[in-house]
């Protein structure tokens, strides 16, 4: 029996609050319509929602952005370099304290103790009404020279993904990667990891209207 799953996604909003009413209206309307048509709907964010170039984000250290994200009911989000590098370590540690969504991140650890951030989880498995297990993993662009200045140590997706595939083997039916890595890395992943089903990309602002199928992986 076939099952339809719809993934709504946002990325690189960069605190463009003037567009938020339209974004929110679209996401909520689209989710309702597709659910009524029988589709399982996931909503995810790909990072760079926060940008301190906007005075409201600057004044609230991104809390105003999280308040808006909360109104959507995201299933999961990851971070971009604007959250990871634009905010101090302390501000990022507090950013998602009142979030009503899960933050997923697999390639950033605290430099001080080597532990992953407390505000993020390495994965999320969502089981649909028909029992399909969807595994969400997430990676952000690993700026190796600048993240350590903020007290974070980034890792390469090329190292982390094989470890995660081994860790979650047999626990999922569909693998979705939330990527703030850029299209070139997304294409590399599709070429080398056919185990991936879908890569939802961001960071480099490429619009793939109908997606791009590489090695059986939908980007």
Where are these regions (language model features)?
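Acidic, metal/ion-coordinating pockets
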Residues: 1-219
């Amino acid at each position: 029996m076939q099952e339809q799953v719809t993934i709504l996604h946002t990325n690189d909003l960069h605190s463009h609050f003037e567009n938020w009413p339209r974004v929110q209206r679209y996401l909520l309307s689209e989710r309702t319509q597709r659910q009524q048509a029988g589709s399982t709907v996931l909503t995810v964010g790909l990072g760079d929602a926060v940008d301190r170039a906007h005075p409201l984000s600057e004044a609230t250290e991104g809390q105003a952005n999280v308040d808006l994200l909360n109104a959507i009911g995201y299933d999961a989000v990851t971070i971009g370099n604007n959250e990871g590098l634009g905010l101090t370590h302390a501000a990022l540690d507090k950013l998602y304290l009142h979030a009503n969504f899960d933050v997923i991140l697999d390639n950033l650890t605290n430099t001080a103790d080597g532990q992953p951030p407390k505000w993020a989880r390495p994965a999320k498995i969502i089981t649909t009404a028909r029992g399909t297990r969807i595994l969400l993993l997430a990676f952000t662009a690993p700026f190796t020279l600048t993240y350590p200045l903020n007290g974070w140590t980034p890792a390469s997706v090329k190292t982390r993904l094989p470890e995660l595939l081994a860790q979650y083997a047999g626990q999922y039916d569909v693998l979705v990667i939330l990527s703030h890595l850029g299209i070139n890395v997304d294409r590399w992943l599709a070429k080398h990891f056919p185990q991936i089903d879908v890569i939802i990309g961001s960071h480099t602002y490429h619009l793939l209207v109908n997606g791009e199928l590489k090695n059986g992986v939908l980007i």
